[in-house]
Amino acid sequence: MKPREVAFLLVLLFLVAIGFIGAYQMHFQPVMPVEPFESALGYPWRLLVALYVFLVLIGTAAIASAGELLRVRELEHVLKEAILIAIVTIAVGLVTIAVDLERVERGSYALLGHTNATSVMYWMIMFYVLELLFLILEGWFVFRSDLLKQSERKGFKGFVAKIISLKFLGKFFAKQNKDLDMSFARAIGVLALLTAVLAYSNLGALFSATHIPLWNDASNPVYFVITAVISGSAMLIFAIIVTSWVKGEDSGKLEALPILRKVLLFSLLSASLFVLWKSVITGYPAISAEGSYSVQNLLFGKFALNFWFLEIFVGIIAPVLILLFFGKNMDALFVASFLTLVGIFAFRIDFVFSAQVVKKISGVSIPTSVHPFEAMFAVGALALALLLYYVLYKLLPMEVEHEA
């Protein structure tokens, strides 16, 4: 390994260790006890909830599965990257929400003995677990033929390929049939796509089911699906370009950029209409005083800088202008994708926190804050996602393309 790679891995491992320390402390020392009083300080849904929403709504899997289902040749070139990113982000996202619960081991009692099939949160978790399982199975069929080729090599990568391909179990798993593998992958991809849409929309429905005015909106399921497409297309563009810079340009993968650029542009324009609609409808004082107060916090209050600069300008206006006028330039496309991801992350933070800012009996609102343990784990979780993607990318046969 090159010295830069070693340094990069050491930094990631250090950040993951910091995140582990934060998670360990949160497990034994709750950072914000939930008080059942109107005068309670703090917010029950905090930074890790926002991070969870950000991670699990990176919809690379939906874009890839849709491209595979519709036989879009350009998107099939980046199918492996899309599946890998989705698996990593959903897995780390589920770990994040588990840490936010602080005593997640108690969840087994509720799941096994007191399952509530009418709970929106129950189905949200189930859909994401199912999506993760479908993605792993779809990925296995997509990678299988290339894993069998890689298993013929000597060394650690060959050993890993033998294990993942299940070649060691006998001749049945050692047979190569690329067309059959891709047929299975497409069939499972349909299930993964349906489950992904259900998971994204169900997560939006979870917020809609609350009494909080800024969240209590029937359009949230659709809006969450749109933002998942935004995150997924931006993340794929970002990953493809960074990989091309590090490993050299791959003409097959770069062919996906024009389509992803269009997907990102139209989804950003759709999201801007939703932002305008939600701001007017929810913020109109005659509809809901509490909802109007939350929107005022976004537009003119303590979240105004986040909303106008990070969400609107950095996350929507700047990327749209770049995509419209400089979208064919790869460097500009990289900047647009990065700005979009920053804006989406800011949106998740604002969406979770600002809705919970309400006036108390005293007439004042409680200031938002992030516990140091939460911040430590959030940094560690993002580092863990990057580390897992890097390691899996190095071990798996990413460069071998399949035929459409």
What are these regions (language model features)?
Residues I90-E105, F173-D181, A346-S362:
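Hydrophobic alpha-helical transmembrane segments of integral membrane proteins
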Residues V6, L10-Y24, V72-E74, L112, ...:
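Long, contiguous internal "core" modules enriched in hydrophobic/ aromatic residues
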Residues W277, L305-F309, I317-A336, L341-V357, ...:
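Intrinsically disordered cytosolic tails
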Residues M1-G59, A66, S354-Q356, E403:
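N-terminal signal-anchor module of multipass membrane proteins
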Residues A61, V88, V95, E102, ...:
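Residues within alpha-helical transmembrane segments of multi-pass membrane proteins, especially transporters
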Residues Y24-E35, G67-L79, L101-E105, A110, ...:
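Juxtamembrane/interface segments at transmembrane-helix termini
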Residues A110-H114, Y293-L299, V357-E374:
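Short, membrane-exposed interhelical loops at transmembrane-helix boundaries
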